Structure formats: structure tokens, C-alpha cells
Amino acid sequence: MNIKTPSTPNNVDQQEIEKFEAIASRWWDLEGEFQPLHRINPLRLNYILQRSGGIFGKKVLDVGCGGGILSESMAREGADVTGLDMGTEPLQVARLHALETGIPVTYVQETVESHAEKYPQAYDIVTCMEMLEHVPDPQSVVHACAQLVKPGGHVFFSTINRNKKAWLMAVIGAEYILKMVPKGTHDAKKFIRPSELIGWIDRTSLREKHIIGLHYNPLTDKFSLGHNVDVNYMLHSQYV
């Protein structure tokens, strides 16, 4: 099956890059701006492990890796991990933290589209978590991820649904009321409906295998997974 060539080789929003560069030094501060990422990471990792059948000894690419939270956790599970990002400061933080912990992760500053041209079908697993809503052309990212994975391999995406409830919870609630993330972290116009993401996936060699919601309960201050995908969700696809 043919995979569409990515149409946006320089698929970068400089304002988004600068936004995360400004707070990159606090990426591994468990009480800082990235606390939610640290708290949901076990849920993300377990989902990847369960749906892929395990990642030990597998070649994994983490697209939009930022400071390396997910990348390091996958490397701890025995995967050969490459983290990909366009932010200079987040990658410096990621490399330093990997040196401090002794966890081997290879970090590369490059767009996923460029990486796909160099390394087609090079990875057993590709993850693209909380990244699609921060680029000008998310469909191009999906196509590139499809190019990068081997036949039979797995690609995982996570993003935010686009509807009024998601705007209220992910922007108004998380940024302005609960102050879980900095104001301006999200642009609701860039949120992505599951039907849109699945449509992009269906135009590649990938097929959607499973979708699940990621929920936050402000009363219990707990994150959990569930069937409701109204706000945050994760999607598992496979090269078939």
C-alpha cells in the first residue's frame, strides 16, 4: 500500500517552539509546568506496552520528545530509543538528564518529515504524544510516522479532541482555573477530532486498532484511562 509523501518538510510553528524553549529548564521539575506530563506518563507507557506486546529490544522513535520524559521511560523498558524534536533547549535538557541517569537515549534535532526521508521503515514502534496539536500540518506528521514504521509495526498518537467540552477542560480549566499548565499552552483551533485523525491514518499504510480516553478528575486529583474520548485521547495504529 502506498504512503503519501509528507507535504510539509518544514512543518514547524516557531511560536510553539519558543513557547517550550522558554520553560525547558523545568522539564524534569516534578512540581513545575510539566507536572501533568510526569503524572500521565505511566498511563501512556503502560498503554504502549500493552498494545504493542512489549518494547524490550525494539527500535522506538519518540516524535516530539521534548525533554525526554516518555523517551527515558521507554528506554528503561529495554527499548532502543531515538527522541526527535525541533526545540534546541528541550533537547539539551533531555541529553543532560539522560547523562545524569545513565539511560541511553539518542536525541536528534530534526523534523519527522526529514527523518522519514532518511530512515523509511526503520522503527518497530513510533510514538507521537501531545505533539500533533502544536504543528501547522498534523496530517503531514501522521504520514511521516507511517513512513518510519516497519511492516507490522505500531504507531501511537495522543492529542486533544476539538469540541466545546475539550476547550472548557483543556484550556479554560487546565490553564486558567486549575493552572495545571501555563496559559497559552494550547490553541483550541488546533485540536483534532478522532474522526480527523483516523481519516489521516486511513490514507497511509496504517490502520487504527484502538482508541482510549485520558481523563482527569479534579475532585480526586487523579488521571485515568476510559472509553470517553471527548477531551484527551490516545490512539494505537498498526502498519498492516
UniProtKB/Swiss-Prot annotation:
Keywords: Methyltransferase, S-adenosyl-L-methionine, Transferase, Ubiquinone biosynthesis. GO terms for biological process: methylation. Pfam families: Methyltransf_23. O-methyltransferase that catalyzes the 2 O-methylation steps in the ubiquinone biosynthetic pathway. Signal peptide: none annotated. It comes from Photorhabdus laumondii subsp. laumondii (strain DSM 15139 / CIP 105565 / TT01) (Photorhabdus luminescens subsp. laumondii). Its EC number is 2.1.1.222, 2.1.1.64. S-adenosyl-L-methionine binds at R44, G64, D85, M129. GO terms for molecular function: 2-polyprenyl-6-hydroxyphenol methylase activity; 3-demethylubiquinol 3-O-methyltransferase activity; polyprenyldihydroxybenzoate methyltransferase activity. It catalyses: a 3-demethylubiquinol + S-adenosyl-L-methionine = a ubiquinol + S-adenosyl-L-homocysteine + H(+); a 3-(all-trans-polyprenyl)benzene-1,2-diol + S-adenosyl-L-methionine = a 2-methoxy-6-(all-trans-polyprenyl)phenol + S-adenosyl-L-homocysteine + H(+). This is Ubiquinone biosynthesis O-methyltransferase. Pathway: Cofactor biosynthesis; ubiquinone biosynthesis. Belongs to the methyltransferase superfamily. UbiG/COQ3 family. It comes from the Bacteria. Coiled coil: none annotated. Disulfide bonds: none annotated.
